[in-house]
Amino acid sequence: MSKEVLKPEHLSKVLQRNDPQQVTDRTFFIDGSNQSLETIPSEILALKELEELHLENNQIAEIPPDIQNLKNVRVLYLHKNNLQCLWPELASLSSLESLDLSSNPLLYSSLTVVSCLRTLRELRLYNTGLREVPTVICKSLHHLELFGLSENHLQSLPGEIVNQTKLREIYLKKNEFSVFPCDLCTLVSLEVIDLDHNKLKAIPEEIGNLVRLQKFYVASNHLSLLPESLSQCSKLSVLDLTHNLLHILPPTLDQLTELTEVGLSENRLEKVPRLLCRWTQLQLLYLRNTCLRGLRRSFKRLINLRFLDLSQNHIDHFPVQICALKNLEILALDDNKLPPTMSSLTKLKILGLTGNDFPSFPEEIFSLVSLEKLYIGQDQGCKISYVPENIKKLKNLKELYIENNLVEQLPASLGLMPNLEVLDCRHNLLKQLPDAICLAQDLKELLLEDNLLTHLPENLDHLVNLKVLTLKKNPIEDPPMEVCAQGKDAIWKYLKENRIRKQMAIKIQAWWRGTMVRKGYGSYEELLKARKKGKTSPKDKKGKKAAKGKPAKRK
């Protein structure tokens, strides 16, 4: 096997990142990720004291035999490479506790080597094309605490999985399970189960055996019912049931009093389950597109909520219960039919109101002094035609989205918003931008597609932090379209040169004025009036030239 594949510049990059003065035989950590490496550098394999080695996202196709020198390595990350085979020498890593081989085209047969790593606590095999889990791994590795198998083609787990008595986390997301792997219910140490994006139709009653379960992810499956025994998982803090076929929840689930995050979006609930209002420790609640028409009065008990998503429902009035949620930081009410009623939620940082029926800009939001992001684009719903000057009251606002409306002009006060970073005005009727926009020095993105702009403010290039400027579908004349098509840098250059030309013109005009006045031709104002009326200058009044061959007449 060649040891000369490594290019010198790659090694220098690795050493430079890890401080070459500190890279010695006593080095404990090396980060060689994202370096286009084709093999593991021999210089790294000589670091016998190395404990943690990151080589992810390279082009490594094989592991050199000298890997066996790294007797002390405890963490080895090799995900996102081109590994197919694992050589027996890998089994010599007697201290290895965490191994990541994800996103490699591994041959199934080569995984036998992994079963020899008896000290492993974490094994990640995401996206490796697995159709079944090697039985030998489940038989031999008795200390696994984390097993990552997401993004494969698994339909079941081997019965030997029951040997993983220390397993705390198992990740099976994006596989092909149509039946819940019941053997998991015997692993009483489990704290995290992720079965998102499978084809599960039911969860067994035995799930109640997992009394230590803290996080349970079963989003994007075909679940129509939940077992009542789930209530025995009393330590559950996260329950994600998003995008299933649920209409109701078992009333016994009100015993899950430690829940802090619940996902129920994309189900057909039609009304908020009564028991939900008893989960008073909830901080994040997702109820998007659940056919809700309102909230229960008891909803106001959820005083610890920080995030609430009620978007894409059938709510036609502002739920006053929300006003009791004083800790709310993010509120999504997009695509409902809300009037502009809003109450003071002093900690609210993100507010989504897209697709609602506002006859005008809802000025009630100006009391939300902590607001950092405001979404009021109206791809559907009643479109607004103006943004009030009082938008400046939102001193902490960083991102303002007003796309898909009928706004004809922007308030000059936008230039007085010291934290504004993103301004999305796409698909409106803007004819010009206020000059004051050039004062919004923190602006990083200015999105102006599909408006009626014919020119840009001459000082727009003063926005030194601007990274993104979009101007497509505008009848731009100044700068010319060919300049705009070249991007922001070309526009900035044009604006600067245009200013210089104007300054020169002003200087020349001032010089001409001074010259005319000094020569006694009258004041500048008189000269200008005479010129406009088409009269001759004072100089021409001193005498007229005679016709050719004739003396001029004297007066």
Regions flagged by a language model, labelled:
Residues 1-413, 419-422, 435, 458, ...:
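The feature captures the LRR N-terminal capping module
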Residues 442-444, 448-466:
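Repeat-solenoid scaffold signature
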Residues 455, 460, 477, 518-523:
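Short, flexible/disordered secondary-structure transition segments
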Residues 508-509:
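Calmodulin-binding IQ motif helices
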Residues 522-536:
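Short amphipathic alpha-helical linker/capping segments at the junctions of internal repeats
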